[in-house]
Amino acid sequence: MKRILSALLIGTVASLALSAAEVGKPAPDFTATDITGKTHRLSDYKGKIVVLESYNYGCPYVVYHYKSKAMQELQAELTEKGVIWLLVNSVHPGHSDYRTPEAARKEWDQLGIKATAWLHDTSGAVGKAYGMRTTPHMFVIDKDGVLVYQGAIDDRAATSGDPRKARNYVREVVNKLLAGEKPEVTQTKPYGCSVKYAD
């Protein structure tokens, strides 16, 4: 199992140079529908901090963060502070990890997800615009619509143990922004499984 997870990690971690969205520049705008049928545009959230999370519960790294409830706790903590948190699920319909909107809503309820919305990005348009390569792969956008962080959720690429003991980059970056300060960390290497795009 360890060997399989190591292969997943080594084979799917993206080079920062491959990211389509650049830290320090305006985040790519997008329009996407969530699993309830509501349309979301990034530009609608100007004036708010936005977190994008590349999500697929078929990945053991994602399971690790959600089974521990650490991800839901962070979502609740930050959304209560006015942060917008969007899950981006770019799994194409032909893959076994694909969720219909109905199945996604059940998964949302069963896991107790506390994000703002789950974007049903089956075309991969949002994921590719940001260069999302792994699940999870995190992005933080400031109130001016500028991408200020992209990379891993934390500094511990693991599937066991307590993620709360890791250094959580997303919490750190968002809290810096909320305090009116410049984040110290702006890019890290994301870890996890590959995003299941159609091509």
Kindly label every feature range from the protein language model.
Residues 30-50:
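A short beta-strand-turn-helix
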Residues 1-4:
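Positively charged n-region of N-terminal signal peptides that target proteins for export
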Residues 7-17:
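Bacterial N-terminal signal peptides
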Residues 140-199:
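Thiol-/selenol-based redox modules, centered on thioredoxin-like
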